[in-house]
Amino acid sequence: MYHVVAATTNPAKIKAISLAFIDVFGAENCRIEGVDVDSGVPRQPLGSIETRTGARNRVMMARQVRPEANFWVGVEAGIEESMTFAWMVIENANLRGESRSASLVLPESILHGIREGRELGDEMERLTGVQNIKHKGGAIGVFTDGKLSRTSVYHQALLLALVPFHNPIYQISVQTTTQ
């Protein structure tokens, strides 16, 4: 059984991680555990590089907290220009898989607050009245009227980040021949 450490205690992220690992390895082969670790980046990461750094840092911290695990998973949401997205980073002892989620263009009413230094989740709570929205459907759920959720979008990106761990083509070593 794989011990999978989710570098988060956010239920929406843990559910996405669980669904992806179950899809790839089967429910009977996975045990998911969430741990509270720091991302090492601002609470609202700006830009792809800062956001991916946050996801990688989460994995690094989770490895320190649970070194005996088989997999460590970091998910970090960020904003780049006018879009929200997230980076997924998955590691085991030998490999790293990474993927970026789909992006959603945010309305100016949200971006204004972000430019003033507030988090997306705080702005969504202010405008919708839904408490702790980032642990639920998130901005994606609100703007798609529930057709998508933070969990469903992250689930797809996590499936892509898992590809190097199970697809045999990724295991082929490149050999060069000299003549």
From Swiss-Prot:
The keyword Magnesium applies. GO terms for biological process: nucleotide metabolic process; thiamine metabolic process. It is an enzyme of class 3 (hydrolase). Phosphatase that hydrolyzes non-canonical purine nucleotides such as XTP and ITP to their respective diphosphate derivatives. Probably excludes non-canonical purines from DNA/RNA precursor pool, thus preventing their incorporation into DNA/RNA and avoiding chromosomal lesions. This is Inosine/xanthosine triphosphatase. SUPFAM superfamilies: ITPase-like (SSF52972). Homodimer. Binds 1 divalent metal cation per subunit; can use either Mg(2+) or Mn(2+). Keywords: Hydrolase, Magnesium, Manganese, Metal-binding, Nucleotide metabolism, Nucleotide-binding. Its cofactor is Mg(2+); Mn(2+). One of its GO terms (molecular function) is ITPase activity. Its EC number is 3.6.1.73. Belongs to the YjjX NTPase family. Signal peptide: none annotated. It catalyses: XTP + H2O = XDP + phosphate + H(+); ITP + H2O = IDP + phosphate + H(+). The keyword Nucleus does not apply.
